[in-house]
């Protein structure tokens, strides 16, 4: 078996190879020198820390979705406008609204609600008697209730329908008219007077039956400070006064006019 040998390299080829190797080493050293000259001695060396990418979005949970819409708490009852108020359905609860002290500030307004011949005074965000429902707004002639996820309106003497207790509709209407004619709200309207977030009394103005209002000596915008001896400037006493109004047919109002106080006696009821 013949093995061919490579011809020996000539001296000129060897010199050329050595020259290229030396030039390569020289260029490498020269590059390192220029790199060190160009870089400042105190230049901070930046370090890069690679961390796993974090999700930009919050994880989706089942609580983010609602099957039947948003509850009234999230919609805020205070956001109800006049058009929504007029379109609310009447309440189906077995309650009657027998009196209202309503003003611009809902937190100072009081509603008198009757259930099973008992009177209860309630304010905004307070639960009505006998039901897991609360008052979200008090108006001069109605209150707005939040019950089982929806809003309902409880109007003055509007909850007794013709089918209750088996009483014929005509008889119920007659009873309602007689009862409505003896409510204080028909003669006097109350609205809170606030000063520095303190209740000063209630502004009086005539109700639908204004003749009786003026006949007893009351004047527009009189300020009532007491009702039947109960101080209307005290929230608890004011509630008690409102509760008793539905059971009496006469009362004494203490009004403050031009810095002077005077008691005005008023009797209502019957066909007056």
UniProtKB/Swiss-Prot annotation:
Entry keyword annotation includes Membrane: yes
Keywords: Cell inner membrane, Cell membrane, Membrane, Protein transport, Transmembrane, Transmembrane helix, Transport
GO process terms (BP): protein processing; protein secretion by the type II secretion system
Chief place where the protein resides: membrane
SUPFAM superfamilies found in the cross-reference section: PDZ domain-like
Transmembrane segments: 17-35
Localization terms from the record: Cell inner membrane
InterPro entries noted in UniProt: PDZ_sf, T2SS_GspC_N, T2SS_protein-GspC
Family (UniProt): Belongs to the GSP C family.
Designated name of the protein: Type II secretion system protein C
Gene expressing this chain: outC
């Amino acid at each position: 078996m013949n093995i061919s040998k490579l011809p020996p390299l000539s001296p000129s080829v060897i010199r050329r190879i050595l020259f290229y190797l030396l030039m390569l080493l020289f260029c490498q050293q020269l590059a390192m020198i220029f790199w060190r000259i160009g870089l400042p001695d105190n230049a901070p060396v930046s370090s890069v820390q690679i961390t796993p990418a974090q999700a930009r979005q919050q994880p989706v949970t089942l609580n983010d979705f609602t099957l039947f819409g948003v509850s009234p708490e999230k919609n805020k009852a205070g956001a109800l406008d006049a058009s929504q108020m007029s379109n609310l359905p009447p309440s189906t609860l077995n309650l009657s609204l027998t009196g209202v002290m309503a003003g611009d500030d809902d937190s100072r307004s009081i509603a008198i609600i009757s259930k099973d011949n008992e009177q209860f005074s309630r304010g905004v965000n307070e639960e009505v008697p006998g039901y897991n429902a609360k008052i979200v707004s008090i108006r001069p002639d109605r209150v707005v209730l939040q019950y089982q996820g929806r809003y309902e309106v409880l109007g003055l003497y509007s909850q007794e329908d013709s089918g209750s207790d088996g009483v014929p509709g005509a008889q119920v209407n007659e009873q309602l008219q007689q009862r409505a004619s003896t409510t204080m709200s028909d003669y006097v309207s109350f609205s809170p007077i606030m000063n520095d977030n303190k209740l000063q009394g209630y502004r009086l103005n005539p109700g639908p039956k204004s003749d009786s209002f003026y006949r007893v000596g009351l004047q527009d915008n009189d300020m009532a400070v007491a009702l039947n001896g109960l101080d209307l400037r005290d929230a608890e006493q004011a509630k008690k006064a409102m509760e008793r109004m539905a059971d009496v047919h006469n009362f004494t109002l203490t009004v403050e006019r031009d810095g002077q106080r005077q008691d005005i006696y008023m009797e209502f009821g019957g066909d007056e």
